[in-house]
Amino acid sequence: MAGASVKVAVRVRPFNSREMSRDSKCIIQMSGSTTTIVNPKQPKETPKSFSFDYSYWSHTSPEDINYASQKQVYRDIGEEMLQHAFEGYNVCIFAYGQTGAGKSYTMMGKQEKDQQGIIPQLCEDLFSRINDTTNDNMSYSVEVSYMEIYCERVRDLLNPKNKGNLRVREHPLLGPYVEDLSKLAVTSYNDIQDLMDSGNKARTVAATNMNETSSRSHAVFNIIFTQKRHDAETNITTEKVSKISLVDLAGSERADSTGAKGTRLKEGANINKSLTTLGKVISALAEMDSGPNKNKKKKKTDFIPYRDSVLTWLLRENLGGNSRTAMVAALSPADINYDETLSTLRYADRAKQIRCNAVINEDPNNKLIRELKDEVTRLRDLLYAQGLGDITDMTNALVGMSPSSSLSALSSRAASVSSLHERILFAPGSEEAIERLKETEKIIAELNETWEEKLRRTEAIRMEREALLAEMGVAMREDGGTLGVFSPKKTPHLVNLNEDPLMSECLLYYIKDGITRVGREDGERRQDIVLSGHFIKEEHCVFRSDSRGGSEAVVTLEPCEGADTYVNGKKVTEPSILRSGNRIIMGKSHVFRFNHPEQARQERERTPCAETPAEPVDWAFAQRELLEKQGIDMKQEMEQRLQELEDQYRREREEATYLLEQQRLDYESKLEALQKQMDSRYYPEVNEEEEEPEDEVQWTERECELALWAFRKWKWYQFTSLRDLLWGNAIFLKEANAISVELKKKVQFQFVLLTDTLYSPLPPDLLPPEAAKDRETRPFPRTIVAVEVQDQKNGATHYWTLEKLRQRLDLMREMYDRAAEVPSSVIEDCDNVVTGGDPFYDRFPWFRLVGRAFVYLSNLLYPVPLVHRVAIVSEKGEVKGFLRVAVQAISADEEAPDYGSGVRQSGTAKISFDDQHFEKFQSESCPVVGMSRSGTSQEELRIVEGQGQGADVGPSADEVNNNTCSAVPPEGLLLDSSEKAALDGPLDAALDHLRLGNTFTFRVTVLQASSISAEYADIFCQFNFIHRHDEAFSTEPLKNTGRGPPLGFYHVQNIAVEVTKSFIEYIKSQPIVFEVFGHYQQHPFPPLCKDVLSPLRPSRRHFPRVMPLSKPVPATKLSTLTRPCPGPCHCKYDLLVYFEICELEANGDYIPAVVDHRGGMPCMGTFLLHQGIQRRITVTLLHETGSHIRWKEVRELVVGRIRNTPETDESLIDPNILSLNILSSGYIHPAQDDRTFYQFEAAWDSSMHNSLLLNRVTPYREKIYMTLSAYIEMENCTQPAVVTKDFCMVFYSRDAKLPASRSIRNLFGSGSLRASESNRVTGVYELSLCHVADAGSPGMQRRRRRVLDTSVAYVRGEENLAGWRPRSDSLILDHQWELEKLSLLQEVEKTRHYLLLREKLETAQRPVPEALSPAFSEDSESHGSSSASSPLSAEGRPSPLEAPNERQRELAVKCLRLLTHTFNREYTHSHVCVSASESKLSEMSVTLLRDPSMSPLGVATLTPSSTCPSLVEGRYGATDLRTPQPCSRPASPEPELLPEADSKKLPSPARATETDKEPQRLLVPDIQEIRVSPIVSKKGYLHFLEPHTSGWARRFVVVRRPYAYMYNSDKDTVERFVLNLATAQVEYSEDQQAMLKTPNTFAVCTEHRGILLQAASDKDMHDWLYAFNPLLAGTIRSKLSRRRSAQMRV
């Protein structure tokens, strides 16, 4: 056995004409035996390299030293294979590659010198070596067969008798072979050359008749080379038989790259079947011969699919069998063929791994003949045994006869044959035996045939072949042989043209003098030129050749009637004189070129300078000419065909859609019926209640107001409807993104919420059709769900409606379907041009909106000039820069100031303010004004609903602020009712310059823009009145570099207005809107996989890495928790949880294991554990003592999800979850701590997890992570609460001494703490106790909507999105935050304008209206954005002795609640805070008085009224501090809220008894771990004073909002106390400090305790105030600055 791998060579050819016309670039590089290919679509990608046995560079000319010629290819491959053949091995060479890559050139070559391919050179070299042999004892014989495999059919190219398709059979001894394939004996190279030429002619004739192309068929040229050696001494002759298979494979191109359709597509499918099977065979053989599988036993799955195609079946021995095989892969160098070339390289790379086991075929005949004779004997015995012996005798007689005698014998013995058939039918298996017998005897006869008989048979076949060609009119040589590549010198003739260049000009037909007839073989008269195939008539045409007086012969073509004959593309119906070079097409597939040598010679003599044609006159030229002359527009035909296909597709899609819709309706009806059954089963009482008639309830006027308020609220409620839109359309968004990624469109789609506000007005195309109808009745701005389209290619952002997305998605699907039929290169070419027809792109403007700014005009009422510096705010609430604008009143003839060279002077614009138009604008934008004036509650100002408990307490700041057109208008400080009362009187006397009917002129000057990012270039600004959309004033664009001085516009615009009531109202309340635009020149959009869920989070790369929050580990003993739907939140508690892992010590005690706290983040730490020691887990819960939270028992403690990474895949089922045995649980009572402590302990055997991570010593720098979940039952709760924590652990050996970390050493060194107090990990949690939602409540009914979240549905191509998901509920919460930010920015601008105007009036020593006085401003500030209209005294101050009426008390209480919500917008228990403040701080004041270090202050107490100036000081003045006592219900959905809080203030036992007797409602617990903020606002030491304590305590405080973490010292690593700043009230009073003589102090009040804190200095105290409550600190600093300015004026 001789094992050797397949020799693989690759060869790259030069560019062809098509590639040169398209300016193709070379993507192939060769160095030695290495071939490298470059991806033209991604040049930056690393080139792919392949290593082969030979890499032939034939891309350049022969002058190149690296050029590989035909000779070199043969020397490397052909000579080696020929040597193997002489050694007795089977040999195979096959060429592979796409059509036109140069396979046939490499294998066959051309007739010119040095252009012959491997086959001719190998045949010539074969006979050269035979002739050079001088050994008389050696004799050689060569036999040749030539076949073609086309569409899985085999044709014999050498024997004209074998016209049909030959059968491929398999013999148990010979293997696969072609039955009746002629093997012709040859004695010289000329014989082989003639046979190859004859075979190519036969191939050409057959291909032309059948309208085929050689590139779609495989050609196999077999040489059977026999060597006989006679040993004179022993008189024994030995033989070596070698089979040389030379294969020219069909093209490997894809159907889409050739445009194949119909029959061509079928042919391509069959070709690709052969090549695909060949690829499978090569891959399977390479897999078997690869390293890992080479020494393994052959499995049943190691199947080689040889039989899947004829080609691989016949080449079975050559592929991995008894053969020496070489493969030549032909490559195209052009970039347009990159995909096919890369496929060829990979094909060849797999082939080189195949190993063949070749053996020397020595003396095969003797053994073969013996085995065949044995088989014949066995088969005969079988037939005799079945009584069919006479059949064999008759068969032998028929086989031995000549063809003529056989026919006569058959005719004479018809009766006997029929009887034989009858006998065969009744003898099972006999027909197959006879067939095999015939087959075997035929092979025996072929093997026993002598060499002389083979030569005689070869000669007979040659004569038959030449006679057949002569009958067809093919020109012959004088000796009778066929003409090869030969051109007559005088006689006119026709040469064939073929699609395959190697088959063109292969057949030559003489046109004799006189008449030459062309037609079919079965014509009435004998035809001189015989053609066949479709559209060829029996008598097709006549060529008439006449000689005129010795001059050249004139050839005339006369078509017969009805025959399709074309000359130079024009159909010929009358005799036509032919000229040399004319193209003649007969029928549909026969293409010829007419050559007239004499005529051509005379033409050259007459016009010696005749130009050569620009392109070769070949088959393609003739076909193109035919289409042009016949007026056939292929493009139009293709479009028509495409239109028909589209219509058919549309019809079928409509039918499918209709059927799908019917099916959907059917399913929906079934689901609805099932849903009704479920509803009737689970909510029977709801249906019964609904069916019962309800009695009409008599409501009071107040109750009617509340009902009307609730109706309006729920009518415009949008939270759930927006969520339904997000859920229902998520699948469309995901599909659009998937198609965009697959088509490489560089466009991202994501949901976005848009609200119609001043900073973000909605464009008309985004408003739904019903927007105009409900605009007048809608009290709140409309919020819509839109799609944000981020065009990364052009750096543009567009907004689409959901309807537009669905429409575009249909077009995207059609584009995706069409993309499968278009080559990828064409798609990318089209992608470079953004056209209006692409559904992914929209037209984008050059300028993009940077942001908007607003300038109020109330200074024109006085009039004083003002210069504003206003913020430029984007639609997302981001401050993009600042704009300086000056507004002043001028006289009509006043000239503009001189600003130097940068002046932009505009003329005076005349604008009219129509009262009716402005009133319409006000009614459309602020429809709630009318309701407000009729006494409607201000609760109607709420915009954003649905934050659960927040809705129960009262309107939040974001709810009020978001309403940009409210009853008490949002301008607040500019237009509240109290200011109107103060303004109207003085203004009526002072508005001489604004008399009705007069012309008033004022000037708006756009001065400068600053702090605008450099990503916006060419900045310009335009401004207009807010209710006018038809015209705007614009500045000139300025270049923006982001550096240097501000951009100076200095644009002056004078505006003249006829004074009307609407104009005066406008400048009192409305601003001018300034819009800043710029050209955006960066593309900052991230890829889809980087899409963040919340744009508000800080970038995590700047902060330490934190562990992700895991979901609870599922319980093993408890039944599946069916969480009921939570209703309104009842209360919330902050939990501080300690986790300890205790290990068994030598003395029998369990000591907490050491915890490494390095990392600096709270609630983190690594347990350092010993291997193989018993352990216990201790969990301690700490929280404030409250009546609602009572722990009952620990139901289960489970641990699982053992891993070595912080992240975990929670979707997988963990088999190693372990439920721990609870050893103890209960309350503990540490000394000097009034908080509640609940502790439980469980035994943990880590070996029970059966995890290697827990059983072994942890490798260096690796950590083990585990998740713990505790299920704790609480009283009055429907289900257990779950506390979940991720542990980080490192296991050391049992006897290892753990080195204490730096933090632990510092802790021990201080001596202030025991080691056990630091060996714990903390966690901060929020416990929410919610009521169980009523099944029949509107909230439950809304939650039971059948709207499915489609974001989880699978979409084809979703895996390419790399984890991207559509935005969902979090988008609504983020948008609320954005709306609040926009509202706050708007309020800041109003307040800044108000303060600027007041300061301007004071500095100008003008009388300041009472509405702008400092005392009045304090009153306004205390009310936030809405103030009550309180009666004023003559001096303009509120009378402290005057009793407020009911409405005023309601407004005062509402203001208190609004202010507490403003400072702590997440705080939901403001009514409790008031009572807690009083009780706890009163206790603190008593403690202060008892402290001997404090001076006695008599009966002075620290009351909430004195320590909470933010609540009451602003409303009632600094001189009379008292707590408001509301005596009526507030305008709130819970009218008993505040009176109940007042009653709680009284420490009455009766009150407590009543509380105990109240029936306890079941609650739903929910515990969420709080993610610790990485941002430290402030840290340092503070002194604490709590009630019932002896004195001040010094603690280390770290503020990470919204929590403040308390430590015993700065060395302490364990959190001892946490303070939730979001629910705490921070209070500060200078008077209280002076009274108690405790400087630098402030108070923090929670629901359960009050704490007094003292800082080291005044500056330190203000820093702490800013860290605890930035808004309060800002208020204090503002008051201090006003106080200092007032003192300076005094």
Curated annotation (Swiss-Prot):
Q: Which residues form the Kinesin motor domain?
A: 5-354
> Per the record, what is the consequence of mutating R216P?
In NESCAVS; reduces accumulation in distal regions of the neurites
Result of mutating R350G? In SPG30B; reduces accumulation in distal regions of the neurites
Result after altering N272S: In KAND; uncertain significance
Q: Which residues are involved in binding Mg(2+)?
A: S104
Q: Which Pfam families does the protein's record reference?
A: DUF3694, FHA, KIF1B, Kinesin, Kinesin_assoc, PH
Give the GO terms filed under biological process for this record: anterograde axonal transport; anterograde neuronal dense core vesicle transport; dense core granule cytoskeletal transport; regulation of dendritic spine development; regulation of dendritic spine morphogenesis; retrograde neuronal dense core vesicle transport; vesicle-mediated transport
**Result for mutant: S217Y:** In KAND; affects subcellular location; contrary to wild-type, does not accumulate in the distal tips of differentiated SH-SY5Y cells, but localizes closer to the cell body in transfected cells
One function term, GO molecular function aspect: cytoskeletal motor activity
Phosphoserine is found on S416, S418, S419, S932, S937, S1310, S1337, S1528, S1532, S1548
Q: What protein family is recorded? A: Belongs to the TRAFAC class myosin-kinesin ATPase superfamily. Kinesin family. Unc-104 subfamily.
Its job:
Kinesin motor with a plus-end-directed microtubule motor activity. It is required for anterograde axonal transport of synaptic vesicle precursors. Also required for neuronal dense core vesicles (DCVs) transport to the dendritic spines and axons. The interaction calcium-dependent with CALM1 increases vesicle motility and interaction with the scaffolding proteins PPFIA2 and TANC2 recruits DCVs to synaptic sites.
**PANTHER family in the record, alphabetically?**
KINESIN-LIKE PROTEIN KIF1A ISOFORM X1, STAR-RELATED LIPID TRANSFER PROTEIN 9
This chain belongs to which protein, by name? Kinesin-like protein KIF1A
Q: Which organism is it from?
A: Homo sapiens
Identify the gene encoding this protein: KIF1A
